[in-house]
């Protein structure tokens, strides 16, 4: 896996991740409730970094976490929905011995996302979105938990990865991360669409500092894209820019996301 910083490759990483989950889930119509406990083991094999990094970030680690979550989805289709919404909220409590993390307080992670689709006409759809993820605890957050931003697909390389227009590759972020997005999609021919999209976000070391310009940083990105909806999945291409990369980038994709 490669990690980038402001659009430049900063880290090459190889690791093994093992997960054991014990829990329960219940569905009611379009909503799912889940809770349980996870055991995660991360073993880092190779690490090549161009930037100085905290060694604690990539220590081999065993994590025991308690989790609870709600997921709702009534979007009318997968690749180009025109109505409905999806949202999810979850809470994780991470430890390394069931009670503490490195002889300190456990790490709390609150995660929320929302996406809605509104169609003023049969060919035009407005899709706003919101993502938020906040960590609190000891402050020595490992790579397995730390916030990550970039790409177009949530959780593409790591479960905590949040998409952002104009940041096409995964980048590490601070402990408090809020992102808002907007996609304007127009159907031009049968199964063919063009979109204009944008993202704005803020991140900081502490949640209460996220609106303080001296303690936080903002991110902004814009893009334009084309999509063809085939029976094998959507074919997509996108041109974009962000104030993180400070250059025009591109993304291409094919197929459904599972």
Named regions from a protein language model:
Residues 1-7, 45-53, 81-83, 97-106, ...:
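Outer-membrane beta-barrel translocator domains and adjoining extracellular loop/strand segments
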Residues 220-229:
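C-terminal structured domain segments
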Residues 185-220:
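C-terminal hydrophobic structural anchor segments
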Residues 67-69, 75-189:
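C-terminal outer-membrane beta-barrel translocator/porin domains of Gram-negative envelope proteins
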Residues 33-37, 68, 87-89, 128-132, ...:
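Membrane-embedded beta-strand positions of outer-membrane beta-barrel proteins
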Residues 1-71, 75, 149-161, 170-178, ...:
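Gram-negative/organellar outer-membrane beta-barrel architecture
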Residues 5, 28-30, 39-45, 72-74, ...:
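Transmembrane beta-strands of outer-membrane beta-barrel pores
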Residues 14, 60, 81, 104, ...:
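A generic structural micro-feature
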């Amino acid at each position: 896996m490669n990690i980038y910083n402001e659009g430049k490759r900063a880290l090459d990483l190889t690791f093994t991740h093992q997960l054991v989950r014990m829990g329960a889930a219940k569905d009611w119509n379009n909503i799912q409730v889940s809770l349980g406990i996870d055991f995660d083991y991360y073993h880092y094999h190779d690490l090549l970094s161009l930037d100085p990094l905290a060694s604690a970030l990539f220590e081999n680690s065993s994590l025991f976490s308690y989790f609870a979550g709600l997921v709702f989805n009534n979007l009318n289709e997968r690749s180009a929905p025109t109505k409905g919404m999806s949202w999810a909220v979850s809470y994780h409590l991470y430890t390394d011995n069931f009670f503490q993390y490195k002889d300190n307080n456990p790490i709390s992670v609150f995660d929320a996302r929302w996406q809605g689709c509104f169609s003023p006409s049969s060919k035009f759809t407005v899709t706003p979105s919101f993502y938020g993820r906040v960590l609190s605890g000891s402050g020595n957050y490992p790579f397995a938990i730390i916030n990550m931003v970039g790409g177009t697909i949530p959780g593409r390389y790591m479960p905590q990865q949040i998409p952002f227009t104009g940041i096409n590759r995964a980048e590490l972020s601070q402990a408090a991360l809020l992102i808002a997005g907007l996609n304007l999609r127009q159907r031009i021919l049968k199964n063919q669409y063009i979109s204009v999209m944008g993202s704005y976000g803020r991140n900081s070391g502490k949640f209460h500092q996220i609106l303080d310009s001296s303690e936080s940083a903002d991110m902004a990105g814009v893009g334009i894209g084309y999509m063809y909806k085939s029976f094998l999945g959507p074919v997509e291409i996108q041109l974009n820019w962000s104030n993180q990369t400070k250059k025009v980038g591109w993304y291409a994709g094919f197929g459904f996301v599972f």
